Design a protein with these regions (language model features):
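Intrinsic disorder/low-complexity segments enriched in polar/small residues
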Residues: 4, 14-20, 43-45
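Short amphipathic
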Residues: 1-9
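C-terminal edge-of-domain segments
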Residues: 35-46
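A short, charged, amphipathic alpha-helix used as a generic interaction element across diverse proteins
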Residues: 9-33
Length: 46
């Protein structure tokens, strides 16, 4: 398994990044982190 962290200013931008990432990799799970200034997603993929 591989892991990646995606970071964006808004949840909408993060979702777009994740959709693009998902087209390239077989994503097994995602954990979202939402902070006042930015959002992040920890992605595990094969």
């Amino acid at each position: 398994m591989n892991k990646a962290v995606l970071v964006a200013d808004t949840i909408f931008e993060l979702t777009e990044q994740l959709e693009h990432f998902h087209t390239l990799h077989n994503v097994t799970y995602v954990v979202y982190y939402v902070f006042p200034d930015y959002c992040a997603a920890e992605v595990q993929y094969k």
